[in-house]
């Protein structure tokens, strides 16, 4: 698997599928505020060949737009880049039903790419299973579907993670490197955890949203291994929820000695016990169809394994605010 340190030590370039002006501009703002000399976005597939206007600081710039993924292969060379000397990423902003085919096509044309962030929700579950196999077979770092992306402060902003305005980027200190990793399936809660951590004075080593669909390509277990293997990461801030077995995979990692770093965790969804039948919450997996996957059972298992687990979200905020 790709390492976070490998991302930091390389030059990262992004190819975008789909035209979402706010997200694209936020990446350019992040690059500019991080003090980079050049933008990280190489080009955008919009369905037509030409250029799109964006801003680099106060200066207006033109970014190449392409008719299809086929045109991606020429962009690195046109920009004077050698693929084996740069980390090439895909930011896929297309709809759920187009996510699989377009990601496959991208990796077919750029097999040396580092990985991808898949933004769309409601990717068909069969497509998600194929994406998981694609990620495993290719050893790429792929977050999503239904992910706000991947952030390595001062280095890479792959998606809307952390916010899409310069004010959000500055106030969350997204350009400053630190030692706290933020991990969650939820995109909204990933951004909230970033605000909580940095608002308390901590700075991030990296942050990622695994993705809110039922079958994410990168599992929470994989994300924790990334944090364990990252020398800059000292602590992990994790937000989970009822449903699924992910937290038991984390317990196993801890018990086997494969994860050793400090974790502050919150598992949401204890309110489900107040209903005659467990309700379906916002994310696809957020439903406790058996006692083992209730929020209370997961909290207990994580606590026994040695994780610092909060009993309320206010307690979670208090614990997180003490991270430095």
Could you say what each language-model-derived stretch is?
Residues 1-324:
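Catalytic-core regions of core metabolic enzymes
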């Amino acid at each position: 698997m790709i390492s976070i340190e490998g991302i930091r030590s390389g030059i990262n370039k992004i190819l975008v599928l789909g035209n979402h002006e706010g997200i694209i501009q936020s990446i350019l703002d992040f690059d500019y505020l991080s003090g980079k000399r050049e933008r990280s976005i190489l080009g955008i597939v919009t369905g037509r060949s030409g250029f799109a206007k964006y801003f680099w600081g106060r200066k207006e710039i033109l970014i190449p737009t392409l008719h299809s993924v086929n045109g991606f292969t020429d962009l690195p060379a046109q920009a004077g880049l050698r693929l084996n000397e740069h980390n090439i990423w895909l930011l896929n902003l297309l709809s759920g039903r187009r996510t699989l085919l377009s990601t496959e096509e991208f990796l077919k044309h750029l097999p040396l790419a580092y990985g991808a962030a898949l933004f769309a929700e409601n990717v068909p579950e069969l497509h998600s299973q194929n994406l998981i196999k694609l990620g495993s077979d290719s050893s790429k770092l792929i977050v999503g579907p239904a992910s706000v992306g991947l952030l390595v402060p001062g280095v890479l902003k792959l998606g809307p993670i952390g916010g899409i305005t310069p004010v959000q980027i500055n106030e969350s200190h997204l350009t400053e490197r630190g030692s706290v990793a933020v991990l969650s399936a939820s995109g909204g809660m990933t951004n909230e955890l970033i605000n909580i951590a940095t608002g308390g004075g901590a700075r991030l080593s990296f942050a990622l949203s695994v993705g809110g669909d039922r079958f994410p390509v990168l599992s929470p277990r994989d994300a924790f291994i990334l944090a364990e293997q990252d020398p800059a990461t000292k602590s992990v801030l994790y937000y989970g929820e009822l449903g699924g077995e992910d937290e038991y995979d984390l317990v196993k990692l801890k018990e086997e000695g494969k994860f050793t770093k400090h974790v502050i965790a919150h598992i949401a969804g204890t309110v489900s016990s107040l209903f005659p039948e467990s309700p379906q919450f916002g994310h696809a997996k957020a439903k406790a169809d058996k006692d083992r996957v209730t929020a209370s059972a997961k909290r207990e298992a994580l606590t026994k394994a040695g994780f610092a687990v909060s009993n309320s979200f206010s307690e979670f905020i208090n614990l997180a605010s003490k991270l430095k």
